Design a protein with these regions (language model features):
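Thr-biased low-complexity repeat/linker tracts and other Thr-enriched repetitive architectures
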Residues: 2-5, 257, 280, 298, ...
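Concave beta-strand-loop units of leucine-rich repeat
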Residues: 8-19, 26-41, 49-66, 78-90, ...
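The leucine-rich repeat
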Residues: 22-23, 44, 93, 114-115, ...
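Acidic Gly/Asp/Thr-rich repetitive segments characteristic of extracellular carbohydrate-active
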Residues: 69-74
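Beta-solenoid repeat scaffold
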Residues: 94-95, 99
Length: 340
């Protein structure tokens, strides 16, 4: 389609094993594209990606390791936007970058590792997605992200180093990362919106030991064949949205021992192997409180004074004791059923 000049939607040219050439010579600046799994040479695909990628003058676009090396050779440490769609299999070293004033996006990259270890701030979003071969991302020095963080569809990703991260001003999503084993967020203090985990089947532990506030919900859902075994957030005090643990069979331990208030519901459903749930500081729940089908032998809600809607504890086959000695106000039904 050499005469095509504009495209109203996304461009996908994917998994065409005999497709060796594409002529879109009149088309420039496509907002969202996926071009992978075809029979194009690396040089032809490089030329096509350069042609189609939208970027401001102060942005860095990396398709090859040489692009990263050339940028670092300039001595620059600040850049507006960084976009990586790496064609080759060499590791990428961008440790020269200290500040990204706009966004960082990494997609469809074949590089096994990317070093951005000295980036301290990202002004907008951090979006790492659909990288089939990427195994490790070093963002060790990253302290602040001004937009959202999303890690999704990275099928080989094992390690993400974000040990210095303190704030994410919007949501933080971690979903469909099949090989991700742990997420250590040892410096994280606040998340502006929802903290969301979905289908990360090898994720053993999520640790955020100094996290104090989540501006939205905390959600773990659909970890049905493994993953999300331990949730360790002992300093979390405020959760504006829901606490939502749903069809995550293999969660065994949840430490939310400082959590005082949940603005929405506490909904724990089909978390079959859950043996330890520490909500010992929880005082108020803004909607319903529901605990269904766990392996808890006790549910101690020793600080709970108010539930704005209903409270139900049911089908917990090992439950021997339920304690809520300070509960004064319950806005709906109280159901304790089939805990046998």
């Amino acid at each position: 389609a050499p005469l095509l000049e504009s495209l109203g939607g996304d461009l996908t040219i994917q998994d065409n094993t005999r497709l060796s050439s594409v002529d879109l010579s009149s088309l420039e600046c496509v907002d969202d594209y996926t071009i992978e799994g075809n029979d194009m040479s690396e040089s032809d695909q490089y030329d096509l990606l350069v042609q189609l990628t939208c970027a401001s003058e102060d942005s860095l676009i990396v398709f090859r390791a040489d692009d990263a090396d050339d940028f670092c050779a300039t001595g620059e440490t600040t850049v507006e936007n960084v976009y990586l769609n790496v064609l080759g299999t060499d590791p990428i070293d961008l440790s020269c970058i200290e500040t990204i004033t706009g966004y960082l996006e990494i997609e469809n990259s074949l590089a096994p590792s990317i070093d951005l270890s000295n980036v301290g701030t990202i002004g907008d979003e951090l979006y790492i997605h659909e990288n089939d071969d990427l195994e490790s991302i070093d963002l060790y020095g990253l302290a602040e992200v001004g937009g959202y963080i999303q890690l999704s569809g990275n099928s080989s990703l094992v390690n993400v180093y974000m040990d210095s991260l303190e704030t994410a001003d919007s949501y933080f999503y971690v979903q469909n990362n099949d090989q991700l084993e742990a997420l250590e967020l040892s410096s994280l203090l606040t998340i502006g919106s929802t903290f969301y985990f979905y289908e990360n089947q090898n994720l053993g532990e999520v640790s955020a030991p100094v996290l104090q506030e989540i501006g939205g919900s905390l959600q773990f859902s659909w970890h049905t064949s493994g993953g999300a075994e331990s949730i360790y957030m002992p300093s979390l005090e405020s959760l504006s949205g829901d606490l939502y643990l749903y069809y995550s069979y293999y969660i065994e331990e949840v430490d939310l021992s400082s959590l005082v208030e949940v603005g929405g519901q506490v909904y724990i459903y089909q978390v079959n192997y859950l043996e330890s749930l520490d909500l010992s500081s929880l005082e108020e729940v803004g909607s319903q409180l529901y605990v269904y089908n766990t392996s808890l032998d006790s549910l101690d809600l020793d600080s709970l004074t108010e539930v704005s809607s209903s409270m139900a504890v049911s089908n917990n086959s090992s439950l021997e004791s339920l304690s809520a000695p300070l509960l004064e106000s319950l806005g709906g039904d109280l159901t304790i059923q089939d805990n046998t």
